[in-house]
A protein has these predicted regions:
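TRNA-recognition modules of translation machinery and tRNA-sensing kinases, especially anticodon-binding
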Residues: 2-233
Length: 233
């Protein structure tokens, strides 16, 4: 009997597919630290000091490094990349990042304390919400098939204005996939850019949920339990 061999994790497969979709559109891959400063994780993104996302029950704060958190999203990485692009005079620019994020929350079939998030941003002149919807529609069709049902709904986030949420049909119900919108003027100011000159679209959501729909995996927690049934990938 032959020995079992290791295989690429489905989330690694999906990460590479997602990167390919966006690099084909001209996006650059951005990387950043998992141990993030409060400034980039919250302040840059116009998150108020009293916002519940900053609470201990939602965020892992690091006692040994005051003012640092385990990043709750990779939007912080996109903010860093856009800030550097502005300093180097490389605008227009577009960035994509996939990485581990951490939330101090209860787990269930669609929520986990650690998961992979995909975040992106595009900055330049004359960028609109129509561009954002076009980019995201293209992405989900490439990842989930041309017949995937996608819906955009108005929402609110402190770092975007206007804001939308993206939903996909899964098991006959709408599953929230991503938050997105046009960067709030304060976000652009915080990274040293002029909101009267530049517009920026931002989007971010769980990579794990895309995998659940793509491969019919019923529980997000399976990805992190060493389940041997994932060997099929």
């Amino acid at each position: 009997m032959s020995e079992a061999s290791g295989k690429e994790h489905p989330l690694s497969i999906l990460m590479n597919e997602a990167y390919q979709v966006f690099t084909d559109l001209g996006f650059e891959i951005a990387t950043g630290p998992e141990l993030e400063s409060e400034w980039y994780n919250f302040d840059v993104l116009n998150v108020p000091k009293d916002h519940p996302a900053r609470d201990m029950q939602d965020t892992f704060w690091i006692k040994e490094k005051e003012g640092n958190v385990l990043r709750t999203h990779t939007t912080a990485t996109i903010a860093r990349a856009m800030e550097l692009a502005g300093k180097e005079g490389r605008i227009p620019a577009a960035f994509i990042s996939v990485g581990k994020v951490f939330r101090n929350e209860a787990t269930d079939v669609t929520h986990e304390m650690q998961f992979y998030q995909i975040d992106g941003g595009m900055i330049g002149e004359n960028i609109s919400l129509a561009d954002l919807k076009g980019v995201l529609s293209h992405f989900y069709k490439k990842m989930l098939g041309e017949d995937v049902e996608i819906e955009f709904r108005p929402s609110f986030f402190p770092f975007t204005e206007p804001s939308i949420e993206v939903f996909a049909k899964w098991k006959g119900q709408w599953l929230e996939m991503m938050g997105a919108g046009m960067a709030h003027p304060n976000v652009l100011k915080n990274i040293g850019l002029n909101p009267n000159k530049h517009q920026c679209l931002l989007f971010g959501g769980g990579l794990d949920r895309i995998a659940m729909i793509k491969w019919g995996i019923p529980d997000i927690r399976f990805f992190y339990q060493g389940d041997l049934r994932l060997n099929q990938f």
